[in-house]
Regions:
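Short, ordered loop/turn segments at secondary-structure junctions
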Residues: 15-17, 41, 64, 93-94, ...
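A conserved active-site cap/scaffold subdomain adjacent to cofactor or substrate pockets
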Residues: 103-167
Length: 218
C-alpha cells in the first residue's frame, strides 16, 4: 500500500521481500513499480533518507529486543540531523509477555541468548517462582547441546529451575544502555502474534514525542 499508492520508498531487510502480506509481497509490489530498497540495518535506511530528501522513506522495523535498539538509534540520529523524510513502520515485539502467554504449553523454555543479552535474566529467574523452567542457550552446536543437557538434567529432579548456559554473553542485568535507549523512545502496546492472537503489552511503538518518525502517524 505505501509503496504503490503512497509512492513511498520502502527500506527493508532482504529476507522480508518475499514474505506474503495480506494482499501481496514486497517482491510483488516491486514488480508493479513500487520502490523497494534493500538495506542491512536501520542506519542504512536513515542514511538513504538523508541522501534522498525528495523521497519519503519508510523502514520496516521488525524483530525482538535484539534489533529494536538499532531502530531507535536511527530515529535518534534522524532527529539530530533534522531529517524529516524518514520514519519507521514498527512491528517490533518483546519476549517477556510471550513467555507469560506460553508458560503452560511447555516443560522447559530454551531462551534465546541474543535476546537475553539485551534483557538480562531477571525475568527468567522470576518465572521460576511461577513454576516455569528454562535455560539460556548460545548458538553454536556445542552451546546448544550443553544447554539441552543441563535442561534435561535439572528437569529430572522435578523442580522448576533456571540456568544461564551462555554466561560469556548474557548477564543478569543485560545491556542497560540498550534498555535505556529503547525506554526513552518507545513504549509498550498490545500486539498480534501469528497463531497466538493479541498479547497485551508485547509490542512497541514510538512515544508521542517521537511520533513524527512513526509511519502510522505520518
Amino acid at each position: 500500500y505505501l509503496a504503490l499508492e503512497k509512492s513511498v520508498t520502502i527500506c527493508t531487510f532482504g529476507d522480508l521481500v518475499r514474505v506474503p502480506g495480506s494482499k501481496k509481497s514486497l517482491a510483488d509490489a516491486r514488480s508493479e513499480g513500487g520502490k523497494i530498497h534493500i538495506v542491512y540495518s536501520p542506519a542504512d535506511a536513515e542514511k538513504y533518507a538523508k541522501e534522498h530528501p525528495e523521497e519519503e522513506v519508510v523502514f520496516l522495523s521488525v524483530g525482538f529486543e535484539t534489533t529494536t535498539p538499532a531502530g531507535c538509534l536511527s530515529v535518534k540520529k534522524a532527529k539530530e540531523e533534522g531529517i524529516t523524510n524518514y520514519s519507521m513502520l514498527i512491528a517490533n515485539k518483546t519476549m517477556p509477555q510471550a513467555y507469560e502467554a506460553l508458560k503452560g504449553s511447555a516443560d522447559i523454555f530454551l531462551y534465546p541468548g541474543h535476546v537475553n543479552a539485551i534483557t538480562g535474566t531477571k525475568l527468567c529467574e522470576e518465572l521460576v517462582q511461577e513454576g516455569v523452567s528454562g535455560v539460556v542457550a548460545g548458538f553454536t552446536a556445542k552451546e546448544l547441546l550443553t544447554a539441552l543437557a543441563v535442561a534435561l538434567t535439572h528437569f529430572q529432579k522435578g523442580k522448576p529451575f533456571f540456568v544461564n548456559c551462555y554466561p560469556r554473553v548474557v548477564t543478569e542485568e543485560g545491556s542497560k544502555e540498550a534498555q535505556r535507549l529503547v525506554d526513552t523512545l518507545m513504549e509498550a502496546c498490545d500486539s498480534e502474534w501469528r497463531g497466538l492472537g493479541i498479547i497485551p503489552g508485547s509490542g512497541l511503538r514510538l512515544r508521542d514525542e517521537w511520533g513524527m518518525y512513526d509511519a502510522r502517524k505520518k
